[in-house]
């Protein structure tokens, strides 16, 4: 029986690298995978899943109006979703149905919370619906386990207000532990 998996972490933890490794594992056994990433995240080009190890793959994109159930997955062995925090609650429900009604494993990777510690709606629903939830670990600059992230400006100063979604990588965000998150 297929499952819905959610693998979450702070930024710069290797989520995209793991997703690309899983895709490679399936494809090395001549199995077909369906790759998705958010159309919002265009740091490396629209429809590109890119790891910080400079591994890159083309991908399908989803936006708020995308319906995962409308696609014909045919002989797809696994559905892999990067940047899953940008999904809508309805899309998280669609992926749950896809795993359980069409018997296709779905593995989602994303952030749990934003730079203010607020949950992303897509992630909140994945945490509720996923059959298997796994935290991918990374470390804070102080050496503790990073579970949060902060937004920084061009001078490296913390930004505490602003829109929930602002695309950026290491130049805009840092993974931090809870203690450093609350440090003023």
UniProtKB/Swiss-Prot annotation:
- List GO terms (cellular component aspect): cytosol
Positions of the catalytic residues:
83 (proton acceptor)
| The protein's enzyme class | transferase
The subcellular localization recorded is:
Cytoplasm
* One example GO MF annotation: ATP binding
Annotated binding of ATP, by residue? 9-16, 82-85
Gene3D superfamilies on file = 3.30.60.20, P-loop containing nucleotide triphosphate hydrolases
Q: Which GO terms describe its biological process?
A: DNA biosynthetic process; thymidine metabolic process
Q: Which family does it belong to?
A: Belongs to the thymidine kinase family.
Q: NCBIfam families attached here?
A: PRK04296.1-5 (NF003300)
The record's subunit annotation is: Homotetramer.
Q: Tell me what this protein is called.
A: Thymidine kinase
């Amino acid at each position: 029986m297929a499952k819905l998996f959610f693998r979450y972490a702070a930024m710069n933890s290797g989520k995209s690298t793991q997703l690309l490794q899983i895709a490679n594992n399936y494809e090395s056994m001549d199995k077909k995978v369906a790759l998705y990433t958010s159309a919002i995240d265009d740091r490396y080009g629209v429809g590109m899943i890119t790891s910080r190890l400079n591994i890159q793959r083309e991908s399908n994109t989803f936006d708020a109006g995308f319906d995962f159930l409308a696609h014909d997955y045919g002989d797809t062995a696994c559905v892999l979703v990067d940047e899953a925090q940008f999904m809508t609650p309805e899309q998280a429900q669609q992926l749950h149905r896809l795993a359980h009604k069409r018997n296709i494993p779905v593995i989602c990777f994303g952030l749990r919370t934003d730079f203010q510690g607020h949950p992303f709606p897509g992630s909140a629903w994945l945490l509720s619906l996923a059959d298997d939830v796994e935290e991918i670990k990374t470390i804070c600059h102080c050496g503790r386990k990073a579970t949060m992230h902060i937004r920084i400006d061009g001078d490296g100063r913390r930004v505490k207000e602003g829109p929930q979604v602002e695309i950026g990588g290491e130049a805009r965000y840092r993974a931090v532990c809870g203690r450093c998150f609350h440090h003023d």
